[in-house]
């Protein structure tokens, strides 16, 4: 039995999702009395220049590099068992060895497909449990290694795919993808309507435009949607200040029809009152939407995990996938007018959702390492003016 385990969570800043999952797991461990938790961006610390370049290319995949990313994602999948596996296994290895020597963790968790730890286990024989927390509704071979002790996955579908390619079923646990605890709280929606100056008698369209310009023609879309009767449009621009300033001028022409925000800390509040949402199909965003049963319109998924996520939600009846700019307004307006379709999509989201995934993952890890959790009660946060 380990009395006070040290937990090392490895992640990477490719998008916010992997880091967000790492922080959610860190918070959950701490809530269960495990105080010694370290979150490390292994690639960023090991190779900062290469990491910055690849992060830039990753973001460009949303605009000009879609075919390149398609080739990378599906090409690596096909040839992964060859030379790339050997090169990738050693990426970050030097920094990892120093980290393991200095921190001496009892448990290692990956929220990004980092195989340096299991590869080090294979080559050196070190005894340390390794857990992979997959952050999409699909699986890439790069996540899989014989020295990983357990995988936590979003759905039974992902589990079946992994079993089909040789991962023992008993090593895979279907938990859902960890999301922020705020998405699992109960909040009176009237408070939210008042806070954001929204009308509960109108439908609300939430557009999550993001900081990297992943949604095109936002200004023109907003102008079109503002003409739809009994509809309020809410746009979250993230840290894209230029987009926010561009939309504020549109908002001023009819502030009741359009609400524009920058970064919204408690974005779950907007999820709770929206009729449907236009967004990109990241695994964490979709998990959060499922938790609050928000029908989603998925805009032009990037080939790779985003496209796989989108196709899964589309098959389940929880999403409308749009691949052409010219279809955005017409398909969104049609959905907003189809109450039966919206209800069916909400039910589909409900069927996808797995409650308290972070708690399930942490409890499983602690139990397997014979650690008795010491629950620390956390008060529900009050609604705050946490938007810009």
UniProtKB/Swiss-Prot annotation:
Processive glucosyltransferase involved in the biosynthesis of both the bilayer- and non-bilayer-forming membrane glucolipids. Is able to successively transfer up to three glucosyl residues to diacylglycerol (DAG), thereby catalyzing the formation of beta-monoglucosyl-DAG (3-O-(beta-D-glucopyranosyl)-1,2-diacyl-sn-glycerol), beta-diglucosyl-DAG (3-O-(beta-D-glucopyranosyl-beta-(1->6)-D-glucopyranosyl)-1,2-diacyl-sn-glycerol) and beta-triglucosyl-DAG (3-O-(beta-D-glucopyranosyl-beta-(1->6)-D-glucopyranosyl-beta-(1->6)-D-glucopyranosyl)-1,2-diacyl-sn-glycerol). It is an enzyme of class 2 (transferase). InterPro entries: Diacylglyc_glucosyltr_N, Glyco_trans_28_C, Glycosyltransf_28_UgtP, Pro_diacylglycrl_glcsylTrfase. HAMAP family: Diacylglyc_glucosyltr. The gene is ugtP. The lineage of its organism: Bacteria, Bacillati, Bacillota, Bacilli, Bacillales. It catalyses: a 1,2-diacyl-3-O-(beta-D-glucopyranosyl)-sn-glycerol + UDP-alpha-D-glucose = a 1,2-diacyl-3-O-(beta-D-Glc-(1->6)-beta-D-Glc)-sn-glycerol + UDP + H(+); a 1,2-diacyl-3-O-(beta-D-Glc-(1->6)-beta-D-Glc)-sn-glycerol + UDP-alpha-D-glucose = a 1,2-diacyl-3-O-(beta-D-Glc-(1->6)-beta-D-Glc-(1->6)-beta-D-Glc)-sn-glycerol + UDP + H(+); a 1,2-diacyl-sn-glycerol + UDP-alpha-D-glucose = a 1,2-diacyl-3-O-(beta-D-glucopyranosyl)-sn-glycerol + UDP + H(+). Its EC number is 2.4.1.315. CDD domains: GT28_Beta-DGS-like. It holds the Pfam family MGDG_synth. This is Processive diacylglycerol beta-glucosyltransferase. It is found in: Cell membrane. Belongs to the glycosyltransferase 28 family. UgtP subfamily. It comes from Bacillus cereus (strain 03BB102). Pathway: Glycolipid metabolism; diglucosyl-diacylglycerol biosynthesis. GO terms for molecular function: 1,2-diacylglycerol 3-glucosyltransferase activity. GO terms for biological process: enterobacterial common antigen biosynthetic process; glycolipid biosynthetic process; lipoteichoic acid biosynthetic process. Keywords: Carbohydrate metabolism, Cell membrane, Glycosyltransferase, Lipid biosynthesis, Lipid metabolism, Membrane, Transferase. One of its GO terms (cellular component) is plasma membrane. It comes from the Bacteria.
